[in-house]
């Protein structure tokens, strides 16, 4: 939103300097992006009247002029402008003047003729282009000798504000003036809206066919206008200083009313319309050539203003070329409407162009402003272009409901931290146009039609705070006794998990929670993932239920960059559906290991990491927790190299090698190893208990069992551990044999058993019965002792 300070002062009786106003607006939430004067710095330029013009004796394109600059003597100036003539008044820079760019004026000779100054164009003064080739011609009543900066108000400050989407009420000079009045307490002078008398004549019927999209539509016919009339200089200046180019008088009047009071308008050529006006949704196959010379195919989600023949304009966005006014226009139809922001929002992106009107409509326009806008525009048309106005014709659809919001003074003090007197609060609310009514707890306000953003108590507190001035709220540094929170012994710190993974050579990664739907099918067999209603892209259409897909993608990126040994982990949330259909999210830790077990080095052979390498990492991560690894058929993993991680009878995760069928699909030279565990289970741990070191030597017994291939090592270890007593300190596999001497389908598994007594030296009498018990348990499970 751009406006000039001089225009603002016609509605807000403020004497603040431009610098102070800039600070005030910014601190109140209306950020001033730029504040600059209407013209660049220059000095020594006055209004001069050309008294005579003679051809230069020695140059065809130069003229010798004598001008009156108000000093009582005529000044001779040589001028080359093609439009110079006697009787005109123009800007004149005298010797000693300094023009933009530090261009200094001094007496000089031009082809032998003395020139004591320079007659100026708009370009030479740094002013907006007036479309004239030559001197900037001033009005006939311009006072000779007056400083041009003073006459044209070139020291006027132009403010450019960054208006947030919720403050559409500030997209007009009236809205800014109302805001300044509330902030400073100065008088707010609303633009005078005169009810213009109707002189009979024609009317244009209006029908709203989409009442939910258009709450109000008003039209008025004005006949016999002079569309060739010149836009007054005062109006043209205000438009230009608001960043809008003057086009033609009828278009300029519509733009002026929009800037002045905030209501976008449109002007139709009445003679180009057929029948009544309809506000409806576009029909399939309809097209419209717009004022920007673009022809668009209209979608059925688009609101249009149409006549009996077809669409005339994109409602709230841009008019159509077929019904546009021109210099030949004699009869016009003024339009002012209220369109629901929802129907206008997004149309600028949809059709590839926007307008000042759409910028306002999609944020919300005052739904009680339309009649005032028609009256104001009618007044200006009759004043500048003449004509006879007909009656206003109004159609009404669905308008927003009037909202009432309560404000508790106690809550206001709690939130802002300052006790603002009730009388001051009431004054602020009144200046904001919120019509406060006193209640037992504070006030009840009625949100005005121009404030769509006043909906709840917090909105009112924000308004009070910014008008009162956040910088006026005293600093009150929070103080209090801080209690050190206890960390339970059964819960390990989160940072310990990160440190553990980093210490084992894993690098932390972060991936999107939005993933490719195919990943969910491949890595989790999830045919019904949680789908996003508005995905960022097609490849990010669902929420992940596993971390494996993201880790595999990161592996691919590293392989593309010639990294042949990759170890990464991620701690993040996964998403699913509970038994009751509600969404659930759990935090998990996932890891991936690809490539060699150890970095390449001279002291040992290089081998690829296998299932047992990553299983060791998982065991180390869960070292304070009793876990078992149970063979599983997880969809992402190799059927023979995968296990569920079980704790207290509950599956808390899985570990294994990626299934071979995914290697070719995801362009992986070899299978990576992966794991995924519930983070809650990782953070839970048993208490660390002190245990004395035994003074007595341990005893080792090695047992080799012949068992079926279908029987896993874990099955054997579970049986042996179940038969052990407190003397058994460790049972583990140290060798597996297949081949000669064993029946087909059988294998030999060698197990070491470490026994130790904390109080006595173990004897054969104590050891042998226990070993026999272990052998018996294994035999009962289908594993016989190898002889």
UniProtKB/Swiss-Prot annotation:
Keyword match Transport: no
CDD domains named in the record: PheRS_beta_core, tRNA_bind_bactPheRS
Domain annotation FDX-ACB: ranges: 694-786
GO cellular component terms, A-Z: phenylalanine-tRNA ligase complex
An annotated GO BP: phenylalanyl-tRNA aminoacylation
Catalytic activities: tRNA(Phe) + L-phenylalanine + ATP = L-phenylalanyl-tRNA(Phe) + AMP + diphosphate + H(+)
B5 domain sequence ranges: 400-475
Cofactor: Mg(2+)
Sequence positions that bind Mg(2+): 453, 459, 462-463
Subcellular location: Cytoplasm
Pfam families according to UniProt: B3_4, B5, FDX-ACB, tRNA_bind, tRNA_synthFbeta
Alphabetized UniProt keyword annotations: Aminoacyl-tRNA synthetase, ATP-binding, Cytoplasm, Ligase, Magnesium, Metal-binding, Nucleotide-binding, Protein biosynthesis, RNA-binding, tRNA-binding
Cofactor binding remark: Binds 2 magnesium ions per tetramer.
SUPFAM superfamilies in the cross-refs: Anticodon-binding domain of PheRS (SSF54991), Class II aaRS and biotin synthetases (SSF55681), Nucleic acid-binding proteins (SSF50249), PheT/TilS domain (SSF56037), Putative DNA-binding domain (SSF46955)
Keyword Transmembrane: no
GO molecular function, one term: tRNA binding
Family annotation (InterPro entries): aa-tRNA-synth_II/BPL/LPL (IPR045864), B3/B4_tRNA-bd (IPR005146), DNA-bd_dom_put_sf (IPR009061), Fdx_antiC-bd (IPR005121), Fdx_antiC-bd_sf (IPR036690), NA-bd_OB-fold (IPR012340), Phe-tRNA-ligase_IIc_bsu (IPR045060), Phe-tRNA-ligase_IIc_bsu_bact (IPR004532)
HAMAP family: Phe_tRNA_synth_beta1
Family as reported in the entry's similarity comment: Belongs to the phenylalanyl-tRNA synthetase beta subunit family. Type 1 subfamily.
Protein name as annotated: Phenylalanine--tRNA ligase beta subunit
Organism encoding this protein: Neisseria meningitidis serogroup A / serotype 4A (strain DSM 15465 / Z2491)
Record lineage: Bacteria, Pseudomonadati, Pseudomonadota, Betaproteobacteria, Neisseriales
Gene responsible for this protein: pheT
């Amino acid at each position: 939103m751009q406006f000039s300070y001089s225009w603002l002062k016609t509605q807000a009786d403020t004497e603040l300097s431009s610098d102070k106003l800039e600070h005030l607006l910014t601190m109140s939430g209306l950020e001033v992006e730029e504040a600059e004067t209407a013209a660049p710095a220059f000095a020594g330029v006055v209004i001069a009247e050309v008294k005579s013009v003679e051809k230069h004796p020695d140059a065809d394109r130069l003229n010798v002029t004598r001008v009156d600059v108000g000093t009582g003597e005529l000044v001779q100036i040589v001028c080359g402008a093609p439009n110079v003539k006697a009787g005109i008044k123009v800007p004149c820079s005298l010797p000693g003047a300094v023009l933009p760019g530090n261009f200094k004026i001094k007496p000089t000779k031009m082809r032998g003729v003395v020139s004591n100054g320079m007659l100026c164009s708009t370009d030479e003064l740094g002013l907006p282009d007036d479309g004239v080739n030559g001197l900037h011609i001033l009005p006939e009543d311009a006072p000779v000798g007056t400083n041009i900066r003073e006459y044209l108000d070139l020291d006027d400050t132009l403010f450019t504000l960054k208006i947030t989407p919720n403050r559409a009420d500030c997209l007009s000079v009236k809205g800014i003036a109302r805001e300044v009045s509330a902030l400073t307490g100065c008088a707010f002078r609303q633009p005078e809206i005169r009810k213009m008398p109707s002189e009979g004549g024609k009317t244009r019927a209006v029908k709203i066919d989409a009442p939910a999209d258009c709450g109000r539509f008003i039209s008025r016919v004005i006949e016999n206008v002079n569309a060739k009339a010149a836009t007054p200089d005062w109006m043209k200046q205000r438009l230009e200083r608001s960043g809008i180019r003057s086009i033609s008088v009828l278009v300029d009047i519509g733009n002026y009313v929009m800037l002045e009071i905030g209501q976008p308008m449109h002007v139709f050529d009445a003679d180009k319309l057929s029948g009544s006006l309809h506000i409806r949704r576009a029909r399939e196959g309809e097209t419209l050539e717009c004022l920007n010379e673009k022809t668009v195919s209209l979608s059925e989600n688009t609101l249009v203003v149409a006549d009996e023949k077809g669409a005339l304009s994109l409602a709230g966005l841009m008019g159509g070329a077929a019904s546009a006014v021109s210099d030949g226009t004699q009869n016009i139809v003024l339009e002012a409407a209220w369109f629901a922001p929802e129907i206008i929002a997004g149309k600028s992106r949809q059709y590839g162009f926007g307008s000042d009107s759409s910028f306002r409509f999609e944020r919300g326009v005052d739904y009680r402003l339309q009649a005032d806008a028609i009256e104001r525009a009618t007044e200006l048309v009759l004043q500048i272009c003449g004509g006879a106005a007909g009656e206003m014709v109004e159609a009404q659809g669905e308008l927003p409901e009037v909202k009432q919001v309560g404000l508790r003074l106690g809550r206001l003090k709690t939130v802002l931290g300052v006790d603002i007197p009730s009388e001051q609060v009431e004054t602020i609310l009144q200046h904001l146009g919120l019509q406060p009514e006193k209640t037992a707890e504070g006030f009840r306000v009625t949100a005005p039609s121009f404030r769509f953003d006043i909906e709840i108590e917090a909105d009112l507190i924000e308004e009070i705070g910014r008008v009162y001035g956040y910088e006026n709220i005293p600093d009150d540094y929070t103080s209090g006794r801080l209690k050190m929170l206890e960390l339970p012994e059964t819960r390990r710190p989160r940072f310990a998990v990160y440190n553990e993974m980093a210490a084992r050579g894993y690098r932390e990664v972060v991936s999107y929670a939005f993933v490719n739907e195919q990943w969910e099918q491949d890595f989790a067999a999830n045919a019904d993932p949680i789908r996003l209603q508005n995905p960022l892209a097609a490849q990010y259409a669902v929420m992940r239920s596993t971390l494996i897909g993201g880790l595999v993608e990161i592996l691919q990126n590293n392989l593309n960059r010639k990294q042949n040994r990759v170890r990464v982990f991620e701690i993040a949330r996964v998403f699913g559906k509970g038994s009751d259909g509600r969404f659930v999210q759990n935090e998990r830790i996932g890891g991936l290991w690809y490539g060699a077990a150890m970095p390449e080095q001279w002291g040992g052979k290089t081998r690829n990491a296998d299932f047992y390498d990553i299983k060791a990492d998982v065991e180390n991560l869960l070292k304070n927790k009793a876990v078992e690894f149970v063979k599983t058929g997880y969809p992402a993993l190799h059927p023979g190299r995968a296990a569920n991680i079980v704790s207290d009878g509950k599956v808390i995760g899985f570990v294994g090698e990626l299934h071979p069928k995914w290697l070719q699909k995801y362009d992986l030279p070899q299978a990576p190893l992966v794991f995924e565990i519930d983070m809650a289970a990782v953070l839970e741990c048993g208490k660390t208990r002190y245990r004395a070191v035994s003074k007595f030597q341990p005893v080792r017994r090695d047992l080799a069992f012949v068992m079926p291939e279908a029987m896993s090592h874990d099955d054997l270890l579970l049986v042996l551990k179940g038969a052990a007593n407190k003397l058994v300190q460790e049972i583990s596999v140290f060798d597996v044999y297949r081949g000669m001497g064993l029946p087909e389908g059988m294998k030999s598994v060698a197990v070491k058993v470490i026994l130790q007594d904390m109080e006595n030296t173990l004897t054969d009498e104590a050891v042998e019965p226990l070993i026999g018990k272990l052998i018996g348990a294994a035999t009962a499970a289908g594993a016989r002792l190898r002889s």
